[in-house]
Regions:
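Histidine-anchored nucleotide/phosphate-binding helix
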Residues: 214-228
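Gly-rich Lys/Arg/Thr-decorated short loops/hinges at beta-loop-alpha junctions or inter-strand turns
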Residues: 129-144, 193-207, 310-315, 357-362
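Ferredoxin-type iron-sulfur electron-transfer modules in oxidoreductases and energy-metabolism complexes
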Residues: 17, 35-56, 73-99, 144-163, ...
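Conserved phosphate/anionic-ligand binding catalytic regions in large, soluble enzymes, centered on
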Residues: 28-30, 64, 142, 161-183, ...
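Short amphipathic, charge-patterned alpha-helical segments
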Residues: 44, 221-223, 371-388
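Flexible inter-domain linker/hinge segments
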Residues: 101-163, 326-338
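Hydrophobic alpha-helical positions that pack around
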Residues: 118, 246-372, 384
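Accessory "access/gating" subregions that flank catalytic or transport cores
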Residues: 147-187, 344, 349, 357, ...
């Protein structure tokens, strides 16, 4: 006799897979409310029938859209932005978790023209992954460069970096491979690798975004450098104004140690290397490599005379690699893909990509990573969208507070080291600060001298005293006191600072001053600002009044 089956059918619904939502943890996004948006999303979806996995990723670099919320869909990640906490309820009602339509919907993020036109090499993972997730890092190509490097003799690693054409991204543009070989050729047993993360130039934020958005990449680059030159210890020197970057790098180092990416016998290779974070005290001069080394040693940040260079006698008198964040962060990609793949990007002696940072009076500020050779006009118009104020662009300062002011007639310059040097300018760290037609260029020239006088370490007279005299002379010029004579004095002073200063602090301060006088001379032909009225005119700001 057959017993009837009385088991009730299973009518329970299987648990739904969580929907992945991304909200940046980058400090720029946090400054405009990303944390509150993340909290609102978690609160609104808690206990719902659609489980949500919230990932705090880095920023994509489209800063005018922050906080940028992304939702993973079968078609790809759909973006919404800029999102405020008050928008969350409406977004969820409109089907946010399915990529639904809404006025803030931007479409598939990877297809947005701002991103689609770029060559993201160094920034390939930033904004895509959870910065402190080792699984994310490995899933997106992490450690490929280090594993390749560890299979090669140190000399071949240096050859690969040299053949790639990688130059220092901190401003000087010195070939990275040459610096590495100099350190490797030193016989000292104790050597160091130092990452200069004292990003103090106005309008620059790429180093911060790397540290906050892809810290393992930077650790990987430092470890490759250590293998190449025989170093066992390295330091990050991070400016105190970057607390989020400091916290992220410290957390990443601890995680790397637990996964044997740092410490003894790294990945079974026999390499021993460890990293430490040191926080600067806020001095701009410590962005200069020898001042940074002085600060790392616990001393006041002052410039060291050269020679000897740090590659021969650096930290604690030992051979030391000092490279910028972007330089070291690019090394893993070069080792993973090969020197030729990187060398094929760019133009002339400027190979690979540069991370341009658009700031100042600009409609769409953010990160643009593209091959060298793009023009300044393309960056300003195609990416930046003109000024935030809606007024015409009058000038752009490229390369930080010591960079030249470029007029509209030079906006078709290709963005590469040689073209800028020929034009009397420099690329620097890739920062662009935009000014509209209301800017007073005499005031900007004065500011360059004033900035130098405040930030000078004081070690050399041309910088320490010359910058103070520069402020005084410019004040006399715009006040109408013996203009021609004082312009001649200013020119002589600029020559003295350029030729006599110990470092680029005093040596480059004349660059913005001279460019302002050369390209915007009308701004120096008006009476002083005391009691005067500024009015806009087609060429810039004029000061009305009698002389």
């Amino acid at each position: 006799m057959t017993t009837p089956d009385t088991t009730a059918p299973d009518t329970t619904t299987p648990p739904k897979s969580p929907v992945t939502v991304y909200v940046p943890r980058d400090s720029a996004a946090r400054s405009v409310g990303a944390d509150a948006v993340a909290d609102a999303l978690l609160s609104a979806t808690a206990g719902g029938d659609r489980p949500v996995e919230l990932v705090r990723n880095g920023s994509r670099g489209m800063l005018w859209l922050e906080p940028l919320v992304e939702v993973a869909t079968p078609e790809g990640r759909v973006g919404y932005g800029p999102v405020a906490p008050s928008d969350v309820a409406d977004l969820l009602a409109a089907g946010l978790l399915d990529g639904g339509d809404h006025p803030l919907r931007l479409g598939l993020v990877e297809e947005l023209p701002w991103l689609a036109r770029q060559n993201r090499v160094t920034f390939a993972r930033i904004g895509v992954t959870d910065p402190l997730s080792t699984e994310d890092y490995l899933r997106h190509g992490g450690l490929e460069g280090l594993r390749t490097a560890l299979r090669l003799p140190p000399a071949e690693v240096i050859d690969t970096v040299t053949e790639s054409g990688l130059r220092g991204r901190g401003g000087a543009g010195f070939p990275a491979g040459v610096k590495w070989k100099t350190v490797a050729d030193c016989a000292d047993e104790l050597k160091f690798v130092c990452c200069n993360a004292d990003e103090g130039d106005s309008g620059t934020f790429a180093d911060r975004m790397v540290m906050e958005g892809d810290p393992f990449m930077l650790i990987e680059g430092m470890t490759i450098a250590a293998h190449a030159v025989g170093a066992r210890e390295g330091y990050f020197y991070i400016r105190s104004e970057y607390p989020d970057a400091v916290a992220t790098m410290r957390a990443a180092i601890e995680i790397a140690r637990t996964h044997n990416w740092l410490g003894e016998d790294i990945l079974g290779s026999g390499l021993t290397f460890d990293l430490h974070v040191r926080v600067g005290a806020g001095a701009y001069i410590c962005g200069e490599e020898t001042s940074m080394l002085e600060s790392l040693e616990g001393k006041r940040g002052t410039v060291r005379p050269k020679p000897p260079i740090p590659a021969v006698e650096g930290l604690f008198g030992k051979p030391t690699i000092v490279n910028n964040v972007l330089t070291l962060a690019t090394v893993p990609v070069i080792l993973a893909r090969g020197a030729r793949a990187y060398q094929e990007l760019g133009t002339g002696r400027s190979r690979g990509t540069q991370v341009f940072q658009l700031g100042g009076n600009i409609a769409r500020g953010g990160i643009v990573e593209t091959a060298f050779g793009i023009t300044l006009r393309e960056l300003l118009e195609d990416y930046g969208g003109g000024t935030f104020s809606g007024r015409p662009v009058r000038t752009v300062q490229v390369g930080g507070p010591l960079g030249a002011y470029l007029p509209e007639s030079q906006f078709d310059l290709p963005m590469d080291y040689e073209a800028f040097a020929e034009a009397g300018a420099m690329l620097g760290h890739g920062g662009l600060v935009v000014f509209d037609d209301t800017v007073d260029m005499a005031a900007q020239a004065r500011f360059a001298m004033e900035f130098c006088s405040v930030e000078s370490c004081g070690k050399c007279t041309p910088c320490r005293i010359g910058s103070v005299r520069g402020v005084e002379v410019i004040d006399r010029i715009v006040a109408g006191e013996d203009r021609d004579d004082n312009l001649a004095v200013l020119e002589d002073l600029c020559d003295l600072m350029t030729d006599g200063s110990l470092c680029a602090m005093g040596g480059l301060t004349p660059m913005p001053v001279r460019s302002a006088i050369t390209h915007f001379s009308d701004d120096f032909l008006v009476r002083g600002t005391r009691g005067a009225v500024h009015t806009a005119h087609p060429g810039g700001t004029r000061t009305e009044g009698t002389t």
